[in-house]
């Protein structure tokens, strides 16, 4: 299968990584390799590319083969960024990029089971070795747990109705395909909700997050990224939904202002020191022109921070 991957907020990403010759950068979400390719073009540097999907990793490695040993592909979840960096014999890196969510390659491949618009198996695993699939979640989770997931991870207002419909239907026959599930979700929501965004969008997002343990991975990945950054190194994160963006925003805030002393204390006694300086006080978003060219960019938000020299 061919990639049709268009990197989001490309120029903004390059600008905020503050590239320099001789630097080492981690593209923690390699995907189609578009961001990595531009980094390697713009500076005489090295890029370590992480992806947990071996198919995506192999495609990107072919795309970036002209850069020779300046590109280092590694099959790994970015929650393991510290282990990867140290295993490669690197003490620290000059920048980390995280472009979150599902890559175009995964979305456009029905066999991956991420899309509610193309029929495929209920899979949704970013790492094919992950034992948990979307079918496991949909067919075995108790109704209360489905409601919680749809509320928390999908911010879906009709979570109870959808969960009830899923449980009722699976008692007769388990769900096996993405379109089966999408059609059941459409039937479960009120008619007015069907006229807005596709009714299955939030539920599919929630199931995907559960299958891949995405929020915990992001928390661990952010912590690891800060630890492997050199002083003055940058971390750039692109998010695609409010849960991710809120998590990144709050993490950056905590790292910039970590003091937990009561406000009426005359001085800090907790000993917690800031490790980051936030570069983007407000998230950067794509221009109308970029959104016209790439509809998948419409919900993207970019946040960046720099590691402090005394951290």
From Swiss-Prot:
The organism's taxonomic lineage, starting at the top: Bacteria, Bacillati, Bacillota, Clostridia, Thermoanaerobacterales
GO molecular function, one term: rRNA (cytosine-N4-)-methyltransferase activity
GO cellular component: cytoplasm
Family: Belongs to the methyltransferase superfamily. RsmH family.
Residues at which S-adenosyl-L-methionine binds: 33-35, 51, 78, 99, 106
Region span, Disordered: 289-311
Catalytic activity: cytidine(1402) in 16S rRNA + S-adenosyl-L-methionine = N(4)-methylcytidine(1402) in 16S rRNA + S-adenosyl-L-homocysteine + H(+)
Broad EC category: transferase
SUPFAM superfamilies: Putative methyltransferase TM0872, insert domain, S-adenosyl-L-methionine-dependent methyltransferases
Cell compartments where the protein resides: Cytoplasm
UniProt keyword annotation of ATP-binding present: no
Key words of the record: Cytoplasm, Methyltransferase, rRNA processing, S-adenosyl-L-methionine, Transferase
Enzyme Commission number(s): 2.1.1.199
Keyword rRNA processing: yes
Organism: Carboxydothermus hydrogenoformans (strain ATCC BAA-161 / DSM 6008 / Z-2901)
Gene Ontology BP terms: rRNA base methylation
Cross-referenced CDD domains: AdoMet_MTases
Protein name (database record): Ribosomal RNA small subunit methyltransferase H
């Amino acid at each position: 299968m061919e990639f049709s991957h268009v990197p989001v907020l490309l120029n903004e990403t390059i600008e905020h990584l503050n590239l320099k010759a001789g630097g080492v950068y981690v593209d923690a979400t390699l995907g189609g390799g578009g961001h990595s390719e531009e980094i390697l073009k713009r500076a005489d540097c090295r890029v370590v590319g992480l992806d947990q999907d071996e198919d995506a990793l192999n495609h990107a490695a072919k795309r970036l083969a002209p850069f020779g040993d300046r590109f280092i592909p590694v099959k790994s979840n970015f929650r393991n960024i510290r282990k990867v960096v140290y295993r490669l014999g690197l003490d620290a890196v000059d920048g980390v990029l995280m472009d979150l969510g599902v890559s175009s390659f995964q979305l456009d491949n029905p066999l991956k089971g991420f899309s509610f618009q193309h029929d495929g198996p209920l899979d949704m695993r970013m790492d094919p070795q992950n034992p948990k699939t979307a079918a496991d979640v949909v067919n075995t989770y108790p109704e209360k747990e489905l409601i919680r997931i749809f509320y928390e991870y999908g911010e879906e207002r009709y979570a109870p109705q959808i969960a009830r419909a899923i449980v009722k239907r699976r008692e007769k026959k388990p769900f096996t395909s993405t379109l089966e599930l999408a059609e059941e979700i459409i039937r479960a929501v009120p008619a007015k909700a069907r006229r807005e965004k596709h009714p299955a969008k939030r539920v599919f997002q929630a199931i995907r997050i559960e299958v891949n343990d995405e929020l915990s991975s992001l928390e661990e990945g952010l912590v690891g990224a800060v630890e492997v950054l050199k002083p003055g190194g940058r971390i750039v994160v692109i998010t695609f939904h409010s849960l991710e963006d809120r998590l990144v925003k709050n993490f950056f805030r905590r790292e910039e202002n970590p003091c937990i002393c009561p406000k009426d204390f005359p001085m800090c006694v907790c000993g917690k020191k800031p490790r980051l300086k936030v570069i983007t006080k407000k998230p950067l978003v794509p221009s109308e022109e970029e959104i016209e060219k790439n509809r998948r960019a419409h919900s993207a938000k970019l946040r960046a921070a720099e590691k402090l020299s005394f951290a």
